[in-house]
C-alpha cells in the first residue's frame, strides 16, 4: 500500500468513526459504503471495543447505543445495492441484535443473510443458521418455562428450522421436541398431555417427537410420546378420537410420516400462554 492509499484509508476510518450525528452517518455511508476493506478495519476496531468492556451490561450498552446505530445504515446500504459477498458487519449486527433482544430486526436480517449463505466471522465455531436456531431455542425454552408467550418468534423460526435451514441433526431434533412440548402446554404454561382434548394436536406432537427420535435417538421423547398415546386412548374410549380421520400413530417409531408444519404453527399461534410455573409432561 502506497502512502497516498494509506492516508486515504486513515481519513476514511476517521470519517466512519465520527458518525454521532445522522447527517454525518449518511455522508459516511454514501462515501465509504462500497469500501469494504476500510469498513472491515473499522468493524474490527468496534468489535474490539466491545470485547474490552469488563461487564456484560457495559457490552450491551455499547452494542445498543453505539455499535448498532453506527453499522445498521451500512447494512441497509449493502442490502439495497443487491451485491452479495461475505459481509461481517451484517453478521455482527445480527449477533448484537440478538444480544440486546431485538428479535424482530435480528430475525429479519438473519433470514436475508442465510439466504445469501453468509458465514459467521472468523473464529466462530458455528454456522449462522445454527447460531440463530440456538438463540431462539434458548429464549423459547426460558420464556415458555415462565409460562409466557413465545410467539411470533418461535413459529417464525420453527418453519425455517423444520423445512429450510441446513442444521445439525441434534439441533433440529431438539427444536421438534420443543415444538411438541409447546403443543401440549395449557394456557397457563403447564406441559400436560392429559389436559389436551384435541386429538389432532396429540397426533402432531407424537409425529414431531418421532421425527426428533429419528434424527437423534437420544432426544428424550419416549415419555412424551407415551403420555400422548395414553391420552389418545382415553379420547378414543370416549368417542373423541377417530383413528380413521387422523394419521395413525402407535408410539415411538422409526417410520417417517409427513408432518403438516403449517398446521403445527397454526395450533401454536392459536394458543397463547399466561404467566405460570412450568409443569411436567
From Swiss-Prot:
This protein's record includes keyword Hydrolase: yes
Organism superkingdom: Viruses
GO process annotations (BP): viral capsid assembly
Protein name: Probable terminase, endonuclease subunit
GO molecular function: DNA binding; endonuclease activity
Keywords attached to this entry: DNA-binding, Endonuclease, Hydrolase, Nuclease, Viral genome packaging, Viral release from host cell
InterPro entries, sorted: Phage_P2_GpM
Family stated for the protein in its record: To phage P2 protein M.
Lineage, top ranks: Viruses, Duplodnaviria, Heunggongvirae, Uroviricota, Caudoviricetes
Amino acid at each position: 500500500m502506497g502512502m497516498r492509499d494509506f492516508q486515504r484509508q486513515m481519513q476514511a476510518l476517521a470519517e466512519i468513526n465520527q458518525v454521532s450525528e445522522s447527517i454525518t452517518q449518511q455522508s459516511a455511508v454514501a462515501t465509504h459504503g462500497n469500501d469494504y476493506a476500510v469498513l472491515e478495519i473499522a468493524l474490527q476496531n468496534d468489535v474490539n471495543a466491545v470485547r474490552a468492556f469488563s461487564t456484560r451490561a457495559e457490552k450491551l450498552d455499547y452494542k445498543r447505543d453505539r455499535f448498532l446505530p453506527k453499522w445498521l445504515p451500512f447494512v441497509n446500504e449493502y442490502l439495497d445495492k443487491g451485491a452479495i459477498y461475505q459481509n461481517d458487519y451484517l453478521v455482527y449486527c445480527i449477533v448484537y441484535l440478538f444480544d440486546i433482544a431485538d428479535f424482530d430486526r435480528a430475525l429479519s436480517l438473519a433470514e436475508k443473510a442465510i439466504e445469501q449463505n453468509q458465514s459467521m466471522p472468523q473464529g466462530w465455531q458455528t454456522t449462522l443458521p445454527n447460531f440463530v436456531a440456538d438463540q431462539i431455542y434458548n429464549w423459547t425454552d426460558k420464556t415458555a418455562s415462565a409460562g409466557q408467550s413465545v410467539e411470533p418468534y418461535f413459529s417464525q423460526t420453527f418453519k425455517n428450522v423444520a423445512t429450510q435451514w441446513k442444521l445439525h441433526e441434534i439441533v433440529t431434533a431438539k427444536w421438534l421436541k420443543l415444538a411438541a412440548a409447546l403443543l401440549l402446554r395449557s394456557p397457563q404454561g403447564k406441559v400436560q398431555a392429559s389436559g389436551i382434548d384435541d386429538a389432532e394436536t396429540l397426533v402432531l406432537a407424537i409425529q414431531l417427537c418421532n421425527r426428533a427420535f429419528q434424527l437423534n435417538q437420544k432426544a428424550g421423547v419416549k415419555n412424551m410420546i407415551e403420555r400422548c398415546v395414553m391420552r389418545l386412548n382415553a379420547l378414543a374410549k370416549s368417542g373423541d378420537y377417530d383413528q380413521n380421520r387422523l394419521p395413525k400413530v402407535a408410539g415411538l417409531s422409526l417410520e417417517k410420516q409427513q408432518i403438516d408444519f403449517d398446521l403445527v404453527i397454526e395450533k401454536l399461534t392459536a394458543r397463547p400462554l399466561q404467566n405460570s410455573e412450568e409443569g411436567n409432561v
